Amino acid sequence: MITIDGSYGEGGGQILRTSIALSAITGEPVRIINIRANRPNPGLRPQHLHGILALKHLANADVKGAHVGSRELVFIPKRLEAKKVEVNIGTAGSITLVLQALLPAMAFAKNRVEFKITGGTDVPWSPPVDYLANVTLFALEKLGIMAGIKIVRRGHYPKGGGIIEGYVEPWKERRELVATKYSSIAKVEGISHATNLPAHVAERQAKAAKEELSKLEVPVKIKTEVSKSLGPGSGIVVWAETDCLRLGGDALGKRGKPAEVVGKEAAQELLEQLKPGYCVDKFLGDQLIPFLAFSGGEIWVSEVTNHLKTNIWVVENFLGKVFDLDGEVGKPGKVKVVRRVE
C-alpha cells in the first residue's frame, strides 16, 4: 500500500484528489495521512468527502476514514466499472474540484460514465465550470479524451444548488500532447453570467472585459447569460483560442464589487496568462499532469504553481519518475514527460 503524506507542499485537498484518482486507475491501495494539515480547518471537508464517495462507487472500493474532519484515509480500489455517478455536495462546495478527482478515473473506466453533480458551479478558490467546459475539456480532447459538460443550473456561495451533468467516454487512443509556444491567437470567447440579478450585471461584465481585451486586436465574442437559482451571483470566464490550446481568465462578482471591475479582472487575468507566449495557462497546468503521465508529451506553462509541483510529486509517488520540470514557482516553466506510463 502506498502512503501519501497529505501535508506535503501546500498540503491542500489536491493531494487527496490526485492520490485517490491514481489509486482507482492503477488498482494500487493508498493510505493518506495528515489530510489538509496546513489548512485552517484541517481534515476532510464535505466536497472532499463527496469526491471520495463518488470514486468509491466508481472503483468499487473499500474505504476507511471517510468522514468530515478525518485526517487519515485508506482507499482500496477494485474495478472501475460504474456507469453512472451522482454526487450531491449538499453545500456550495466546488463541483469542479470534485470533477478534478473524477475525470482521470472516469477516463480509465471500461464503459462510458455519465455523471450528475450538485453543489457550487462558480465559487471562490476553484475553477468555474465554464473554464472546465471550455478550456480543460478542449485540452483533454487533444489527448484523445471525449467528454462533455452541461450546466443545468448555476450555484454560488453560500447557497449552492448548482447542477451539472456530463459524460466521459473510455480513453481508447492516447495521443501525445506537445503544447509549447503559441504563434497566433485566432479569437477570444467568453461567457458572462448573472444569476438572480439584473441582466445589466452580465452585460456590464462582458463590456468591460471586451474593452480590456481589445488590445489583442483579435475578434472578441462574450455571450451573456441570465438565470435563476437558489441565490444570487455573477461571474465571467474568457478564453483565447491559440494555434495550440486555449488559455483562460476568470473572475467572480460579489456584493459591493462593480460589474466593470469583475469583467476587467477576468480580462487582465487572461492577458497575464498570454504574456509569456506559452500554450498552457497556470490553471490548466496542474490539471493536465495526471493525464500527461499516460499520454506522454511536453507542456510549457505560463506559470509554475505549487499545485503543479504537488501533482507531479503525487503522480511520481504512484508511478515512479515520469516528469522533468524546468522552472520555479511563480515563473513560466516547462514540463516534459521523460517516461510515459503504459
Swiss-Prot record:
InterPro entries: RNA3'-term_phos_cycl_insert (IPR013791), RNA3'_phos_cyclase_dom (IPR023797), RNA3'_phos_cyclase_dom_sf (IPR037136), RNA3'_term_phos_cyc (IPR000228), RNA3'_term_phos_cyc_type_1 (IPR017770), RNA3'_term_phos_cycl-like_CS (IPR020719), RNA3'P_cycl/enolpyr_Trfase_a/b (IPR013792), RPTC_insert (IPR036553). It catalyses: a 3'-end 3'-phospho-ribonucleotide-RNA + ATP = a 3'-end 2',3'-cyclophospho-ribonucleotide-RNA + AMP + diphosphate. Its EC number is 6.5.1.4. It is found in: Cytoplasm. It is an enzyme of class 6 (ligase). It holds the Pfam family RTC_insert. Keywords: ATP-binding, Cytoplasm, Ligase, Nucleotide-binding. ATP binds at Q100, F283, L284, G285, D286, Q287. The keyword Transit peptide does not apply. Belongs to the RNA 3'-terminal cyclase family. Type 1 subfamily. Catalyzes the conversion of 3'-phosphate to a 2',3'-cyclic phosphodiester at the end of RNA. The mechanism of action of the enzyme occurs in 3 steps: (A) adenylation of the enzyme by ATP; (B) transfer of adenylate to an RNA-N3'P to produce RNA-N3'PP5'A; (C) and attack of the adjacent 2'-hydroxyl on the 3'-phosphorus in the diester linkage to produce the cyclic end product. The biological role of this enzyme is unknown but it is likely to function in some aspects of cellular RNA processing. This is RNA 3'-terminal phosphate cyclase. It comes from Pyrococcus abyssi (strain GE5 / Orsay).
